[in-house]
Design a protein with these regions (language model features):
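Short, charged amphipathic recognition helices of the HTH superfamily
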Residues: 1-10
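Alpha-helix N-cap/helix-initiation sites
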Residues: 3, 16, 20, 137, ...
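RNase H-like nuclease fold core
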Residues: 9, 13-20, 25, 29-117, ...
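Conserved phosphate-chemistry cores used by DNA topoisomerases
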Residues: 28, 44-47, 82-85, 98-102, ...
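Conserved beta-strand -> loop -> alpha-helix junction used to position metal-binding or nucleic-acid-contacting
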Residues: 114-121, 126-162
Length: 286
């Protein structure tokens, strides 16, 4: 939202005429708040880290271009969701992600047990170079989301149910059998779905080595989807942002509002924490 947009909204909604200069001065204060928030100290350990990306439009030298807005969402030892930072980039890659992960480490993170990513190019290598003991796992929520991206609405429910039979399997072997069954049922109509799962299987199958309580936290944590839905509602009417600073302002304010609702720990967190204590005993802090 530009300064002129804010000025117009205030006039339309409240019949208040505020100068562009005053609005600019007020919103510049938000950037200082964002800077302090983005540099705040973080916890020593985050059992789970999720990374997500939203693509928005931004103006640059008179033309509209894509900007990727990356969000890092951590789950604390208390089971609370915490947004760790916002980063804006034209492209993703190993160098970009190495900078992000190094920044998180410099802000105090000493260990991440499981990092859930969306097949982001260069991210697994970056996190493994900074946190070599972290298990990088393809995010099941993202994988399902990408699977149904081009599926007809009438087929989505059935597709999701059949995909669930894969990621809720008790063992990797059972999951492979479920994937084979999925392929036999759907490959004629949607061949790319089973192909995508097989192509990414190396980053999926470690999931089946986790105890059920940890698995539930990974695939039922809907914070990523909630963030996406809430943010898209805000940005879908904005058109192109005037610059990167305006993207930061809007996302920060929106995310601050969303985070106020994160008052309770993740459901079944105590059971998951006990399993983390067993599985990562040498790295676990009481």
């Amino acid at each position: 939202m530009s300064v002129r947009d804010i000025q117009s909204s205030l006039l339309d909604m409240y019949q208040i005429d505020v100068s562009e200069g005053l609005i600019s001065q007020a919103t510049e204060g938000i950037l200082e708040e964002v800077k302090a928030w983005q540099n705040r100290p973080l916890d020593n350990i985050y059992p789970i880290l999720f990374l997500d990306c939203i693509v928005v439009k931004s103006r640059e030298e008179g033309r509209v271009c894509n900007r990727s807005v990356y969000l890092a969402l951590g789950v604390t030892m208390e089971g609370q969701k915490e947004l760790l930072g916002i980063w804006i980039a034209q492209t993703e890659g190993a160098k970009f992600w190495l900078g992000v992960i190094t920044e998180l480490k410099n802000r105090g993170i000493k260990d991440i047990f499981i990092a859930c990513v969306d097949g982001l190019k260069g991210f697994p290598e970056a996190i493994e170079s900074v946190f070599p003991d972290t298990q990088v796992q393809l995010c099941i929520v993202h994988l399902v989301r990408n699977s149904v991206k081009y599926v007809n609405w009438k087929d989505r429910k059935l597709i999701c149910e059949d995909l669930k039979s894969i990621y809720t399997s008790a063992t990797e072997q059972e999951a492979e059998m479920a994937l084979d069954a999925f392929g036999r049922k759907w490959d004629a109509k949607y061949p790319t779905i089973s192909q995508m799962w097989r192509r990414n299987w190396q980053r999926v199958f470690p999931f089946f080595d986790y105890p059920e309580d940890i698995r539930k936290v990974i695939y039922t944590t809907n914070a990523i989807e909630s963030l996406n839905r809430s943010l898209r509602k805000i940005i879908k009417t904005k058109g192109a942002f005037p610059n990167d600073a305006s993207i930061l302002k809007i996302f920060y304010l929106a995310l601050s509002h969303i985070a106020k609702k994160w008052t309770m720990p993740i459901h079944t967190w105590k059971a998951a924490l006990n399993q983390f204590a067993i599985r990562f005993a040498g790295r676990f802090e009481v």
